[in-house]
């Protein structure tokens, strides 16, 4: 990385545990929805994902923030019935949550 693209991992390291916790809670809410089909779990997932988005804004990770916005929009569409809250969309959301966590882990490990 050169100086113009180097990412300062300090701020991310300060909030990473909170991000991980919010991602875990979001995933747990998705799992709860898969077991019960109670749409309130989709709302809980969206709430936790919104917390992740806020932390990403603070640390300046706009690309990942855009992914959280897209996932949040998908969750909202599932919640309102605009998009089916089916296995495929739940799996897609779950993969997105895992991808966010993996990407942030890689950033902290010095990978880009």
Language-model regions, residue ranges each:
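Long, amphipathic alpha-helical coiled-coil segments characteristic
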Residues: 3-48
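Secondary-structure edge/capping motif, primarily at the C-terminal ends of alpha-helices
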Residues: 26-37, 56-59, 75-85, 104-107, ...
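Generic structural signal for well-ordered, non-transmembrane alpha-helical segments
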Residues: 17-20, 24, 43, 50, ...
């Amino acid at each position: 990385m050169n100086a113009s693209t180097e990412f300062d991992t300090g701020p991310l390291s300060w909030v990473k545990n909170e991000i991980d916790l919010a991602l875990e809670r979001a995933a747990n809410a998705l799992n709860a929805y898969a077991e019960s089909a109670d749409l309130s779990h989709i709302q809980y997932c969206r709430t936790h994902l919104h917390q992740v988005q806020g932390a990403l804004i603070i640390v300046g990770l706009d690309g990942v923030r855009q992914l959280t916005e897209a996932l949040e929009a998908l969750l909202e569409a599932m919640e309102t019935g605009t998009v089916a809250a089916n296995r495929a969309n739940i799996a897609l959301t779950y993969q997105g949550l895992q991808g966010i966590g993996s990407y942030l882990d890689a950033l902290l490990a010095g990978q880009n």
